[in-house]
Amino acid sequence: MTPQTRTPVVPEEELERLEACAADGIYSAGVNTVTNLYSAKIFRRWWKGSSVLEMGCGDGNTTRILLEDFDDVTVIDGSRALADKVAGEFPGVTVVCELFERWEPGRTYDTIVLNHTLEHVYDMVQILECAKQWLSPEGVICASVPNARSLHRQAAVLMGMLPAEDALTPSDIRAGHRRVSTPESFRAAFIQAGLRIEHSGGYWLKPLSNAQTDEWFTPEMNDAFMALGERYPDIAAETYVIATH
């Protein structure tokens, strides 16, 4: 049974919010696409089994990679526009358009992927509790979110452009983010949800804003700085967790 909703999420308002974020298209171009693909590259080291649930599909870039490794792919997203896009591009995928808080799959999955999803939800622990119930006994959860201690956020605070490292920027708000986690607060959510953390880390050493990166960085530079973040996870732009029961 799915845990009872303990948050003030109003379904109609939340669905409208998700559609507005999807219509903006902020994740469909530039370095945002690069970072989501790099997340999938990292997750690929740990995901397992033949079935996968992708919680939050974005524009389908991660879905495409999942189809290379899994026979049974299910995607759930609250945005009708994004769900229809993925269903149209990948006819072999089971696509569900619903809020996580209201869904009951009636089955479990070997791997569950939340690629830059948890920063959007109202209650991160509640959603992880749902994911735990939907995870097979030997399964794995792979999740990533932006890191509040990113080098570029620390620089923004020193320059007076951001009041605190975990403050929401205009880009965060535009993308529908509700929080910016530290590595510690992100890991704490998994522990509170009753999950076991097998590995955590970071990627993308990010000295500049997304707009500056899109303007000045070559693909080779993006690749290098994504990888450098794995060497310096505490100040990387993205933080991730690999968790099990």
Regions found by a protein language model. Give the residues of each.
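Conserved N-terminal segment of class I S-adenosyl-L-methionine
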Residues: 1-107, 111-115, 128, 202-205, ...
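S-adenosyl-L-methionine-dependent methyltransferase catalytic module, highlighting the catalytic core
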Residues: 25-31, 61, 122-133, 140-244
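N-terminal hydrophobic or amphipathic segments with adjacent small-residue motifs
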Residues: 43, 50-52, 132, 138, ...
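A generic structural signal for alpha->beta connector loops
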Residues: 70-72, 92, 138, 194-197
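Short catalytic micro-motifs in class I SAM-dependent methyltransferases
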Residues: 116-120
